[in-house]
Amino acid sequence: MADLGSGTPQLRKLGIVPGARWSVIGADPGWRFETTPDAAAEVSGSAPADVVLVFVRAAAELEPALVEQEQRVFPAGALWIAWPRKAAGHVSDLGDSVVRDAALARRLVDVKVAALDHDWSALKLVWRREHR
């Protein structure tokens, strides 16, 4: 998938570096990283991870996704929540403010927003320092 905007490689943008444990949840069939994560380990289920990327398509999916995935990145990992980009013509009741508000209510804070590709934007969430 082509990177938009910054020119930063997609994996680096997401924090998936050699040695990282990562997981992708809910991606569309055929969605993939623009390059293969070298020397990083994909983990599944509820296994702890350094980076979890969750694709959500509607606001109703957001809270369950946060509840299911937030502990996987505790205390120092990153939970990326991706939603369909309205700029690409997608219709969705999600956006950065909806994701941010839901995250703050769960003791998570947003630290970065990124365009993953033409179809998806994402917000990077981490645990607030006082809750680590």
Residues of each region from the PLM?
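Flexible, polar/low-complexity N-terminal or interdomain linker segments that lie immediately upstream
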Residues: 1-16
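Class I S-adenosyl-L-methionine
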Residues: 107-132
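Short acidic low-complexity segments
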Residues: 39-49
